[in-house]
């Protein structure tokens, strides 16, 4: 990784985050969806994005698979590459929050250290860790991409939940039961956003 160049300095923008938030009528923040593959992260995040759009809230969904088609296309699934994947997404999310958006990110992000890294990037009150807690057996039964089947057959190595560890969040900002209806989980998230004064009541 390249070292920071002392000749590269931060350039302050004339329009502040607060001014953008005032214009849009809501605060910028990241909801970081974490959980096993097949837990429902992308499904719940997508439902929340639709709900926010209907409420007139400017939002954007960063999906774990989608970013690997572009921003992170050069990365694999080693521990170092996973960390860099999360770092890049965290930096993009931080820029989006500065633009006043509500950012939804759906990533397995199996390690607590990487999730904490992004929390530290965002600062107090801007990072909401959403743990989509779905039992491994349920995730494996769903297996929407056929990845568990490949992992069990030894065709896919370093797969989270099978031969790579998933570190359960110890202090998630919201703990969702991934076996509940998506509509119910979406309501829970909207209630949280209102309670934290990110969107209007």
UniProtKB/Swiss-Prot annotation:
Pathway(s) annotated for this protein in UniProt:
Sulfur metabolism; hydrogen sulfide biosynthesis; sulfite from sulfate: step 2/3
Q: Which residues bind ATP?
A: 35-42
Per UniProt, which keywords does this protein have?
ATP-binding, Kinase, Nucleotide-binding, Phosphoprotein, Transferase
Any GO BP: hydrogen sulfide biosynthetic process
Record keyword Cytoplasm present: no
Alphabetical list of InterPro entries matching this protein: APS_kinase, P-loop_NTPase
Q: Which top EC class is given? A: transferase
Which reactions are catalysed by this chain? adenosine 5'-phosphosulfate + ATP = 3'-phosphoadenylyl sulfate + ADP + H(+)
Superkingdom per UniProt:
Bacteria
Active-site residues, as the UniProt record annotates them: 109 (phosphoserine intermediate)
Q: Does the keyword ATP-binding apply?
A: yes
Q: Which terms in the Gene Ontology molecular function aspect does this entry carry?
A: adenylylsulfate kinase activity; ATP binding
Q: What is its EC number?
A: 2.7.1.25
Q: Which family does it belong to?
A: Belongs to the APS kinase family.
This chain's function reads:
Catalyzes the synthesis of activated sulfate.
The entry's protein name is Adenylyl-sulfate kinase
Q: What is the lineage of its organism?
A: Bacteria, Pseudomonadati, Pseudomonadota, Gammaproteobacteria, Enterobacterales
Q: Which gene encodes it?
A: cysC
